[in-house]
């Protein structure tokens, strides 16, 4: 069941702050092994998705329901922020964060297009050709 935009804004913001603080608290553990570093990048991609959700919901609350997040500045700003957060933990976390974030953004875009873009019927009328 979907929640209202304002509730989604609060939930995404709080969860993003919790993920950021957990990454900073467990920085030595995340940087200790290769798998933990990849997991840190995965957490960073969740930070990206949640911050993008929060920014998009904030724009929807302030600017109206029809507003959509664009590649620049919303997506770029959130990606740079999550890369900065991952880079403070480990450099490889930032690299894997890019990979996971791009993949997540692709699938979220596909789901969004399926849900929100209704197919438009195409008019296939050929018409009569004039003889000269």
Swiss-Prot record:
Source species, domain of life: Eukaryota
Keyword Transmembrane helix: yes
Membrane topology: Multi-pass membrane protein
Pfam families linked to this entry: Keratin_assoc
Subunit and partners: Component of the oligosaccharyltransferase (OST) complex.
Compartment list: Membrane
TM helices/strands, residue ranges: 1-21, 35-55, 69-89, 92-109
UniProt keyword list: Membrane, Transmembrane, Transmembrane helix
Task of the protein: Subunit of the oligosaccharyl transferase (OST) complex that catalyzes the initial transfer of a defined glycan (Glc(3)Man(9)GlcNAc(2) in eukaryotes) from the lipid carrier dolichol-pyrophosphate to an asparagine residue within an Asn-X-Ser/Thr consensus motif in nascent polypeptide chains, the first step in protein N-glycosylation. N-glycosylation occurs cotranslationally and the complex associates with the Sec61 complex at the channel-forming translocon complex that mediates protein translocation across the endoplasmic reticulum (ER). All subunits are required for a maximal enzyme activity.
One Gene Ontology term, aspect cellular component: extracellular space
Family statement: Belongs to the KRTCAP2 family.
Cysteine disulfide links: none
Record has Transmembrane as a keyword: yes
Native organism: Aedes aegypti
Protein name: Protein KRTCAP2 homolog
